[in-house]
UniProtKB/Swiss-Prot annotation:
Heterotetramer of one alpha, one beta, one delta and one gamma chain. This is Ketoisovalerate oxidoreductase subunit VorB. One of its GO terms (biological process) is sulfur compound biosynthetic process. NCBIfam families: PRK11864.1. PANTHER family: PYRUVATE SYNTHASE SUBUNIT PORB. The lineage of its organism: Archaea, Methanobacteriati, Methanobacteriota, Thermococci, Thermococcales. It comes from Pyrococcus abyssi (strain GE5 / Orsay).
Length: 311
């Protein structure tokens, strides 16, 4: 597609669109933004594997699809196994996988289908060393089935099975560190990314394409519906998650950590700035907020030390 010169000068993302209008995502959906960026990075030479999740519905009902790519729907827990099988089959048939001119096999699964139900298959994919990319789009609950908590749901959050109010059954466990579990497999490349920083996400997608072996990206993707947030605040919320160090951006490449924060020398903003835009946190007490703030800063300090020692 020919890009006008005046447009080209302003572009920081690829011009070509492979995620079309007519999809069924909710307004402000962070996952649909992320999927759009993936297809901008890799184009039509992509095989997407999507399990049961919001994105299964977003793509559209058969025989229609909003995705201009090869698409394989699979069972909830099997993303890691299916991308492993597709990669092995492509190689057996003589196709090049990964690299600039290779086919990109991409698993695209939510936090429930990754951190919980699909964790075993993810581990197998990583351990076997397949040339594919697994992306966990993290909206911090089982949104497609009715906003139930997952192990990626943060401390203090309301969900339909951790309700707030008088009985105060809010989530009392901290968010599972899936990226740490992945890094424990000592794969060549793993990273965190956010829909609020698309240039950073695109750069990491391109790096995952070039590096042989399994790659993993944990993508922060707000869900206004499940987070009880205004639909026009998706990017602001995602940006605040990074600026408060609740969801720091970093890379792990061949044993080395590198922090990718937009303002690395700036102190994190108070966690309240992230929380106050979301109705799911409205039942948190002052003590709850202090607990979450303490955890966020402890994890941020731990990451900085990892980057200092293994950078």
């Amino acid at each position: 597609m020919e890009v006008p010169e005046d447009v080209k000068r302003r572009l920081t993302l690829p011009f070509e669109e492979n995620f079309f209008a007519g999809h069924t995502a909710c307004q402000g959906c962070g996952a649909s933004l992320g999927l759009r960026y993936v297809l901008k990075a890799y184009g039509r030479k992509t095989i997407l594997v999507i399990p049961a999740c919001c994105s299964t519905i977003i793509a559209g009902p058969w025989p229609y699809s909003a995705l201009n790519a090869n698409l394989f729907h699979t069972a909830f827990e099997t993303t890691g196994a299916v991308i492993s099988g597709i990669e092995a089959a492509l190689k057996a048939l003589g196709y090049k996988v990964k690299g600039e001119d290779g086919i990109m096999v991409v698993g695209w699964a939510g936090d429930g289908g990754t951190a919980d139900i699909g964790l075993q298959a993810l581990s197998g994919f990583l351990e076997r060393g397949h040339d594919a990319l697994y992306i966990m789009y993290d909206n911090e609950a089982y949104m497609n089935t009715g906003i139930q908590r997952s192990s990626s749901t943060p401390y203090g959050a309301w969900t339909t099975n951790t309700p707030g109010g008088k009985r105060h059954f809010l989530e009392k466990r901290h968010k599972k560190k899936v990226i740490d579990i992945v890094i424990a497999h000592r794969i060549p490349y793993a990273a965190t990314a956010s829909v609020a920083y698309p240039e950073d996400f695109l750069r990491k997608l391109k790096k995952a394409q070039k590096i042989p072996g399994p790659s993993f990206i944990q993508l922060f993707a707000p869900c206004p519906t499940g987070w009880r947030a205004p639909t026009d605040k998706t990017i602001e919320i995602a940006r605040l998650a990074v600026q408060t160090a609740y969801f720091p951006l970093f890379e792990y490449e061949n044993g080395k950590y590198k922090i990718n924060m937009p303002n690395p020398k700036k102190e994190p903003k108070p966690i309240e700035e992230f929380l106050k835009l979301q109705g799911r946190f409205k039942y948190m007490t002052k003590e709850d907020i202090e607990v979450l703030q303490k955890w966020v800063l402890e994890e941020w300090e731990r990451l900085k030390k990892l980057a200092e020692v293994f950078g």
